[in-house]
């Protein structure tokens, strides 16, 4: 389901503070975040976030096409190893 328009996008408060501090300092360090549910805002464009996927922080460089999406969409939590092959065909 889509969030209702009158509520506006959800962004973690600490995430806004970290992004503002990074913009003010002008440094291009990776900002570590755990909030996969936060929406990417236009003010995040050009910053790099380390989005936690349960094991490590996956670096996500935000560009204009990502605005409006969630951080979790760009940090997969599961690894696909492929379907099991046919055992009879190998012999």
Swiss-Prot record:
Keyword Ribonucleoprotein: yes
Secreted found in the keyword field: no
Family matches, as Pfam families: Ribosomal_S19
A single GO cellular-component term on record: small ribosomal subunit
Keyword list, A-Z: Ribonucleoprotein, Ribosomal protein, RNA-binding, rRNA-binding
GO molecular function: rRNA binding; structural constituent of ribosome
Any one GO biological process: translation
The organism's place on the tree of life at top rank: Bacteria
Family statement drawn from the similarity comment of this UniProt entry: Belongs to the universal ribosomal protein uS19 family.
Role played: Protein S19 forms a complex with S13 that binds strongly to the 16S ribosomal RNA.
HAMAP family, sorted: Ribosomal_uS19
Name of the featured protein: Small ribosomal subunit protein uS19
Gene name tied to this protein: rpsS
